[in-house]
Amino acid sequence: MRSYERSKTAYEEAVKLMPGGVNSPVRAFKSVGMTPIFMARGQGAKIYDIDGNEYIDYVLSWGPLILGHANPQVVEALKRVAEQGTSFGAPTLLENELAKLVIERVPSVEIVRMVNSGTEATMSALRLARGYTKRNKIMKFEGSYHGHGDSLLIKAGSGVATLGLPDSPGVPESVAQHTITVPYNDLDSVRYAFERFGEDIAAVIVEPVAGNMGVVPPVPGFLEGLREVTKQYGALLIFDEVMTGFRVDYHCAQGYYGIEPDLTCLGKVIGGGLPVGAYGGKAEIMELVAPSGPVYQAGTLSGNPLAMTAGYETLRQLTPETYEELGRKAARLADGLHQAAEKYDIPHTINRAGSMIGFFFTNEPVVNYETAKTSDLELFAAYYREMANEGIFLPPSQFEGLFLSTAHSDDDIEYTIAAAERVFARLRG
């Protein structure tokens, strides 16, 4: 058994300083019955806690670190830029460079606005959609988390799913009544909602691969159906690609599935591990954003040199071949975990989209939030604790996916599969 004594001491101090001792709820490790593990450093695919324990990391800061921890090119570029100043409150050439890469690679984006987080991106995109359509209602999907904006914290997933909260106190009913929530992958429910409210629906916001109820890809025809019905009713289609953007494909999920939304929200990978978000789309729509138009959005640190540098240096290293190799590694990991679980009769369903993997402790196919909730949460918690002791760092929630990076070696993956087999044997022992 590993020692977590220093983490326990650090957490005892943290709970006196921050709500729940953390700055984001899922980091509290509540659903897995552990004290939060405090990290000290990372290198490549490995991460090290303050007790000196080493882990193969499949959290990767919740997805952004597609090149692994402390990528040398990113680190060197950040050092160089930091010495010239961290933020100016004025435009820099670095903003242009990252914007050009985003526009070049994301099929639907003609103009992009940089912000500081995925939540900012989705909140801003919704305001823009309402301003463009002059409508009020938004459609989202059960179990999909689009950040902690009031309009979107309705039947959300991720940490909210783990806590069992369908929404949050503090979200006014007057706000919630403008959010329509339907099951993911259910076009009939979408069409029914549009028949009732279609003339007042400004936008449908969707993760093209749901990532906060676990990893749940779209069933064939789902995204195509959303594109069709939104066009029919004059609503905008917003892809929340904060998680999938530059993660599942060189051209993001929209490139992979061949569906172009009206607006796209980005984050995580485009920041290379620093706080960055973005939203973009057709010029006709984006030109409504201030100062070009009347839809207001601003940010003190938006487009700051450090964040732009980390994003640019990350995207610059990614090629179509990168995604082929990541997909190969992820397929091997998913297959190995499946074989290990089968060997010990562990109930499971595995979903994968590119280098994102969802391992659910249920035999039921997971296609939406309701089926994701059939997972055995106690079994997941036991699995999590055992895998941590094996040196595997996983997201401490059944409703989050695993991420791979270019730094993960074949040996890392084979070790992880062998560790899972040992854990499954103990769980069934």
From Swiss-Prot:
Q: Where in the cell is it found?
A: Cytoplasm
Q: Which domain of life is it from?
A: Bacteria
Q: Which UniProt keywords apply?
A: Cytoplasm, Isomerase, Porphyrin biosynthesis, Pyridoxal phosphate
Q: One GO molecular function term?
A: pyridoxal phosphate binding
EC number, UniProt record: 5.4.3.8
Question: Which pathway is this protein assigned to?
Answer: Porphyrin-containing compound metabolism; protoporphyrin-IX biosynthesis; 5-aminolevulinate from L-glutamyl-tRNA(Glu): step 2/2
Gene3D superfamilies hit by this protein: Aspartate Aminotransferase, domain 1 (3.90.1150.10), Type I PLP-dependent aspartate aminotransferase-like (Major domain) (3.40.640.10)
Which Gene Ontology BP annotations are present?
protoporphyrinogen IX biosynthetic process
The terms describing its cellular component in GO are: cytoplasm
Catalytic activity reported: (S)-4-amino-5-oxopentanoate = 5-aminolevulinate
Q: Which SUPFAM superfamilies match?
A: PLP-dependent transferases
Q: Which PROSITE patterns match?
A: AA_TRANSFER_CLASS_3
The protein's required cofactor(s) are namely:
pyridoxal 5'-phosphate
Isomerase found in the keyword field: yes
Q: How does it assemble?
A: Homodimer.
Q: Which NCBIfam families match?
A: hemL (TIGR00713), PRK00062.1 (NF000818)
Query: What name has this protein been given in UniProt?
Result: Glutamate-1-semialdehyde 2,1-aminomutase 2
Name the gene behind this protein: hemL2
